[in-house]
């Protein structure tokens, strides 16, 4: 049963990473994927926030300081960014050390502003952890909030249509 749970969790994360990568999902597709992946903790019609950021010294850290390989560093970053908040569900997409995205989805009813505020507070906690454990700085490029996952999917559709 644990393998199924781990597989389902991995598939849930992959779905959200697809959205972070810019997959142009329509409302019906989002609903169908969330149903099939048994995602009761989040609702697609609630506001979401997406942050784009980088670790300016990430390549140096990976090459010169971190001795455990890229995969373990990614796992350590996911442990920092995807945990620690009872009110929000977070998914980290590591494109490379110079480009990462974090999606924040509320586990409870929140306004768009509350979701954006929760994302900012979470990133502040993550920054403190990165500095404490790895002496790394976080360079936040932007935080964008959306009315819903559907709105994020629509924006992706418009962006990829050009």
Stretches found by the model and what they are:
Residues 121, 125-128, 142-148, 155-162:
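Cyclic nucleotide signaling catalytic output domains
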Residues 92-97, 128-140:
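Catalytic core regions of nucleotide second-messenger enzymes
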Residues 1-107, 111, 148-162:
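Interdomain helical linkers/hinges and coiled-coil/dimerization scaffolds
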Residues 77-78, 115-134:
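Alpha-helical scaffold within the catalytic cores of cyclic-nucleotide enzymes
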């Amino acid at each position: 049963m644990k393998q199924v749970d781990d597989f389902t969790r991995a598939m849930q994360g992959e779905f959200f990473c697809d959205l972070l990568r810019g997959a142009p999902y329509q409302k019906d597709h989002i609903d169908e994927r969330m149903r099939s992946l048994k995602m009761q903790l989040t609702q697609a019609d609630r506001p979401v926030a997406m942050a784009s950021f980088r670790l300016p010294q990430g390549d140096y850290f990976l090459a010169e300081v971190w001795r455990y390989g890229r995969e373990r560093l990614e796992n350590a970053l996911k442990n920092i960014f995807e945990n620690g908040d009872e009110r929000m569900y977070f998914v980290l997409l590591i494109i490379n050390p110079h480009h990462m995205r974090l999606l924040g989805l509320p586990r409870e009813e929140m306004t768009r502003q509350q979701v954006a505020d929760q994302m900012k507070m979470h990133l502040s906690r993550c920054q403190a952890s990165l500095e404490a454990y790895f002496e790394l700085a976080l360079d936040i490029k932007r935080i964008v909030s959306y009315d819903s996952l559907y709105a994020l999917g629509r924006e992706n559709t418009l962006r990829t249509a050009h």
